[in-house]
């Protein structure tokens, strides 16, 4: 215990001694150097042999001098600590070594530092030394020296007296973030290009496919412009009120791009007044049904598809009547479920 207190007392006495006592100061300095040298020799004797087989943890410690005498106006302690001490904490986590800033000027309160230095306690003996960074590593031999090497390389970057280097700029950004003066305020989302989410329901717009309806009954009318084959189901209609291309061609407009393939037309698109509704009302469905129950009058009657229909009924399919539609677009009352027109009697066989 006497040796631990002896060195701090020598340092405190040397600092408190008046500079006019030159010889006394020299003797004290020699005594301090001798005592520190003896401790160093003891440590060297203990570390004379290194056991790497057992892989036991060893303790390494190095004191790195901070160049405050060469650059007295630069705040090395502030750069080493960083905002709220985060820089030194991250440096210790990265290197796996313990780092402590010791020596004269390591405390912010100079009066408190001087008081502790004169107290003579062993834990404050470092206040009489030069400002330095104590690096300590406790690990197996190979890893310990690797950590110490990494720590020395990293600590050297913090001892460069540059106010605008990368470390300093990063600390300024971190400080502004901690103070809440970041340009982009907290809580504001990052602006970016929105992602369009496609709807799961099928589109019913122009050209959109819709689920096919159930098979219709016999005698259901088919849209205009579609080819009807025996036994084939009609094409499902599109949404009501959506403009669709006509079956007959129209004059091309300059700059007009050709539309996609024609989609099925709706029954409500044309109404029942133009074309089918207006002309077939004169001839009721009973006229067609009579041909099944009454005997045939002559052979040509079976091949005459205009039987019972006057000539004006076919003339009404003029091109100008295709463009006229009823404004209400409402379907007439449903008729009987019988066939819309009579098929050839021999076609069934």
UniProtKB/Swiss-Prot annotation:
Molecular-function GO terms, alphabetical: mRNA binding; poly(A) binding; poly(U) RNA binding; SH2 domain binding; SH3 domain binding
InterPro entries: BBP-like, KH_1_KHDC4/BBP-like, KH_dom, KH_dom_type_1_sf, Qua1_dom, Sam68-YY
Listed GO biological process terms: mRNA processing; regulation of alternative mRNA splicing, via spliceosome; regulation of mRNA splicing, via spliceosome
Entry-annotated residues carrying Omega-N-methylarginine: 230, 240
Subcellular location, record wording: Nucleus
PTM annotation: Methylated. Phosphorylated on tyrosine residues by FYN. Tyrosine phosphorylated by PTK6 and SRC. Tyrosine phosphorylated by SRC during mitosis.
PROSITE patterns in alphabetical order: KH_TYPE_1
Gene3D superfamilies: K Homology domain, type 1
Keyword NADP: no
Domain KH span(s) in chain numbering: 65-135
Biased composition, class Basic and acidic residues, residue ranges: 340-349
Expressed in which tissues: Expressed in the cortex, cerebellum, striatum, midbrain, brainstem and thalamus of the brain (at protein level). Expressed in neurons (at protein level). Expressed in brain and testis. Expressed in the dentate gyrus of the hippocampus.
Keyword entries, A-Z: Methylation, mRNA processing, Nucleus, Phosphoprotein, RNA-binding, SH3-binding, Transcription, Transcription regulation
Residues forming coiled coils: none
Stretches the record annotates as Disordered: 181-263, 320-349
Any Pfam family: Sam68-YY
Entry keyword annotation includes Transport: no
Function noted in UniProt: RNA-binding protein that plays a role in the regulation of alternative splicing and influences mRNA splice site selection and exon inclusion. Its phosphorylation by FYN inhibits its ability to regulate splice site selection. Induces an increased concentration-dependent incorporation of exon in CD44 pre-mRNA by direct binding to purine-rich exonic enhancer. May function as an adapter protein for Src kinases during mitosis. Binds both poly(A) and poly(U) homopolymers. Phosphorylation by PTK6 inhibits its RNA-binding ability.
Protein family: Belongs to the KHDRBS family.
PANTHER family per UniProt: KH DOMAIN-CONTAINING, RNA-BINDING, SIGNAL TRANSDUCTION-ASSOCIATED PROTEIN 2 (PTHR11208:SF34), RNA-BINDING PROTEIN RELATED (PTHR11208)
Subunit annotation: Self-associates to form homooligomers. Interacts with SAFB, SFRS9 and YTHDC1. Found in a complex with KHDRBS1, KHDRBS2 and KHDRBS3. Interacts with RBMX. Interacts with the SH3 domains of FYN and PLCG1. Interacts with the SH2 domains of FYN, GRAP2, PLCG1 and RASA1. Interacts with RBMX.
Name of the protein this chain belongs to: KH domain-containing, RNA-binding, signal transduction-associated protein 2
